[in-house]
Amino acid sequence: MINVAILSAIRRWHFRDGASIREIARRSGLSRNTVRKYLQSKVVEPQYPARDSVGKLSPFEPKLRQWLSTEHKKTKKLRRNLRSMYRDLVALGFTGSYDRVCAFARQWKDSEQFKAQTSGKGCFIPLRFACGEAFQFDWSEDFARIAGKQVKLQIAQFKLAHSRAFVLRAYYQQKHEMLFDAHWHAFQIFGGIPKRGIYDNMKTAVDSVGRGKERRVNQRFTAMVSHYLFDAQFCNPASGWEKGQIEKNVQDSRQRLWQGAPDFQSLADLNVWLEHRCKALWSELRHPELDQTVQEAFADEQGELMALPNAFDAFVEQTKRVTSTCLVHHEGNRYSVPASYANRAISLRIYADKLVMAAEGQHIAEHPRLFGSGHARRGHTQYDWHHYLSVLQKKPGALRNGAPFAELPPAFKKLQSILLQRPGGDRDMVEILALVLHHDEGAVLSAVELALECGKPSKEHVLNLLGRLTEEPPPKPIPIPKGLRLTLEPQANVNRYDSLRRAHDAA
């Protein structure tokens, strides 16, 4: 077998210098048949036959390849090393060296790295969207410091496909009610609604994925889409390029927003900061295709958005049973309802930031939704002492240690500490608290504060002060029209009775 240099010399001597095959054979030391074969084949680079010899490792290569693939998926602490694999191969009959196993492992690793670098790369068509045509949505996870703690947050991200204007809103959880709330706030910031929304197959919208474009969409999500009058389009599974703008926005936001973000006192403060920061970035960033800023492109697109309707009632409803202690359980926490609904089934409407209890077609209670460090704070009870007044009137002794009454207003607490030292004071205090069922609570508190200022408060004193505070002013005199006025108005003169009496006596 000759090398490239000799083949090049043979071709040059024959085709350029005109040397005969005999002469070329003499110069190169090759046989005339060999020279003739390469000149007739017209190849410029010699082809070497593939090696067909079987190495000692060849029968064991499938097994070793399987072991390497399995161990690669494990954590580093749990992986077997090559020395252990070599011993197992020897036990199976391998007679080669450990170095040969290491060389094969290096080749396998290089091959896997090359596959990882080249996999997923394909050919795509650039997309272009008209003004007001579509927005893209996606969830992401990021961290922020809230009230001095590092908190993991679920970020709802929206981006207008034409202008590239984007909005972010943070939540503690990624649930249906958060998704609905995020849409309303995003549409408010954009000042309108595009014709179409592009989503992946997120669980907060899609219950199950069928063949092709077939989806079983969540009913509440469908209701929201119908309310806001846009069309929801879902991407193919594992096809992030179909909404590449928002996918890139997720990556860019970590650099532009979350790195170097300040500390926040609450989630509400964080969302206010996110809104202002996003709007500021619209003016700073250039549009990737248009010769203008994102803010300028958004100004052109905003006029094509549909006007906002009223907000969608963004709740998810569940049926709950009230306990005998007038509590409803949700996400490990407890919330109070009026005592008249104890041991009954009610409707719990779950919003992004509050819980509303309803029964018999009306709202019966409302509480802020409890959250902790990135997740629902569990094991807490949120009372409203008003809910227990009807029970307290029957059991006044429960006032002393009743958990719902631990957070009464300060004026009530101070009055309670005074009255409970007197005989029958617990019942008097219960009757004072029950006044809020029939009077404005602010007026009752004012009466209690005035009674405390006098130094010796009592139930009668509070009732007297409340009566004065709530007493209606005397009605204003009604003006009499001229047509109803008397020309000679009667006068109240009691002396006329004396004159009549004297006339009677004289008779």
From Swiss-Prot:
Boundaries of every Integrase catalytic domain copy: 122-302
Domain HTH IS21-type: 6-68
DNA-binding region: 19-40
One GO biological process term: transposition
InterPro entries with a match to the protein in the record: HTH_IS21_transposase_type, Integrase_cat-core, IstA-like_C, RNaseH_sf
Pfam family, one: Mu-transpos_C_2
GO MF annotations in UniProt: DNA binding
UniProtKB keywords: DNA recombination, DNA-binding, Plasmid, Transposable element, Transposition
NCBIfam families hit by this protein: transpos_IS21 (NF033546)
Function field: Required for the transposition of the insertion element.
Similarity comment text for this entry: Belongs to the transposase IS21/IS408/IS1162 family.
Full protein name: Transposase for insertion sequences IS1326/IS1353
